[in-house]
Amino acid sequence: MQFIRGGKLTDANNLSKAQRVAYIDERLQALYPETPIPLDHSDPYTLLIAVLLSAQCTDERVNQVTPALFTKADCPEQMIQLSVEEIRSIIRPCGLSPQKSKAIHRLSELLLADHSGAVPANLEALEQLPGVGHKTASVVMAQAFGMPTFPVDTHIHRLAQRWGLTRGRNVVETERDLKRAFPKERWNALHLQIIYYGREYCTARGCDGRVCEICTTCYPARKHPKRCNKT
């Protein structure tokens, strides 16, 4: 099995990590030249809320729920006028509604108190908000403000291991390895491209490291399922 890189034919049976990185980068750019943001939003605040709601929930479900929420409140000033229970009743289909509704209400209060109602374009400041972890903050920094980050969730963690890009034991270590492997200007697009590819070709159950194009190109001799470290 061979692929073209820089005009040269390369034997995929002997891919180095650098060659795997180059091939994966090339292939994902070819498959997904455009990287639309999957969560519907109109500004940094609505994106922040949508990303928070997407924890353990599909983007499709979030996009079904947020119109009803944002019709009532699409800014911190309006959100704090709703009760936690009102928020909870709207977002219930997204799951974890008791925790998420409290976080949405409280972070809206803090944005008004500490940031004049604006979502801060600062990773550390975002991580201080209720319900906002490193991955959520990284997504907001990348998609709302265009700052180079490489948000890694369990799905990206799994694919990075299948593709031999990391031996990370968790998403923190995998994020570190991916940032080292790819140029900074590719981080934001790659985050989305890997997600798109994983959903379409390298699914959790549909590919065990021996099925999809990237897995078979990078590891044509792999005979056993690739076991991935869980986060």
Predicted regions and their residues:
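Catalytic cores of DNA base-excision repair glycosylases
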Residues: 3, 9-230
